[in-house]
Amino acid sequence: MATPAQLGLQNATSPIMEELIAFHDHALMIIFLISSLVLYIISLMLTTKLTHTSTMNAQEIEMIWTILPAIILIMIALPSLRILYMTDEFNKPYLTLKAIGHQWYWSYEYSDYEDLAFDSYITPTYFLEPGEFRLLEVDNRTTLPMEADIRMLITSQDVLHSWAVPSLGVKTDAIPGRLNQAMLASMRPGLFYGQCSEICGSNHSFMPIVLEFIYFQDFEVWASYLYIVSL
């Protein structure tokens, strides 16, 4: 999760987020080099009085400033297209989780388990336990198995929402009447926080998302327990 005075992105816990951070650093370095070159040229123009008033054209320079930007754009586009392909790749997901946005809470349905569904509301401040985070805790955490491909189906019951968990590299719009899908996976156990990222009304800021990734055997025990309780 984000921390005060944090510089940079959140720590990655999924392969997609690791690729996004690497691409961010790659693109940022290219932008830094271009900006440095432009500032250097501007400083030269401001500090020298030498001009070439007799120069009418310069074919070599024109070729350089046409070909070089094209090469730079290709260097940025190829990694970006690779990541776009990875985000849309769905290979035999272990389970399917459906997230439904409401004003102002989330509902979750485990499609592979019978009658396994619940609502997830924000925990009021006066109910928080020591060590919990204000505006980020929920009454029912979404529990998932780690090291497993999970397909998310995301929609909305009323207005536009957006289901986002930064450390997993997932941000998908929840649109009424439409199912959007995303793939997520965590390489380690733990709690991961997110929020609705689409302004959806007066309580938009009170729609947190909490994912708890646990080991496979613990997840099966958890799912069995919820099924027994719901009987």
Curated annotation (Swiss-Prot):
Question: Where along this sequence does the record place binding of Mg(2+)?
Answer: E198
User: Its catalytic activity?
Assistant: 4 Fe(II)-[cytochrome c] + O2 + 8 H(+)(in) = 4 Fe(III)-[cytochrome c] + 2 H2O + 4 H(+)(out)
Q: What class of enzyme is it?
A: translocase
Q: Name one Pfam family in it.
A: COX2_TM
Q: Which residues cross the membrane?
A: 15-45, 60-87
Required co-factor?
Cu cation
Q: Where, in residue ranges, is this chain on the Mitochondrial intermembrane side?
A: 1-14, 88-231
Query: Keyword Mitochondrion: yes or no?
Result: yes
* Membrane disposition: Multi-pass membrane protein
Q: What is its EC number?
A: 7.1.1.9
Protein residues bound to Cu cation A2: C196, E198, C200, H204
Q: Which InterPro entries match?
A: CcO_II, CcO_II-like_C, CcO_II_C, Copper_CuA, Cupredoxin, Cyt_c_oxidase_su2, Cyt_c_oxidase_su2_TM_dom, Cyt_c_oxidase_su2_TM_sf
Gene Ontology BP annotations: ATP synthesis coupled electron transport
Please explain the role this protein plays, according to its UniProt record.
Component of the cytochrome c oxidase, the last enzyme in the mitochondrial electron transport chain which drives oxidative phosphorylation. The respiratory chain contains 3 multisubunit complexes succinate dehydrogenase (complex II, CII), ubiquinol-cytochrome c oxidoreductase (cytochrome b-c1 complex, complex III, CIII) and cytochrome c oxidase (complex IV, CIV), that cooperate to transfer electrons derived from NADH and succinate to molecular oxygen, creating an electrochemical gradient over the inner membrane that drives transmembrane transport and the ATP synthase.
Return the similarity comment: Belongs to the cytochrome c oxidase subunit 2 family.
Q: Specify the protein name.
A: Cytochrome c oxidase subunit 2
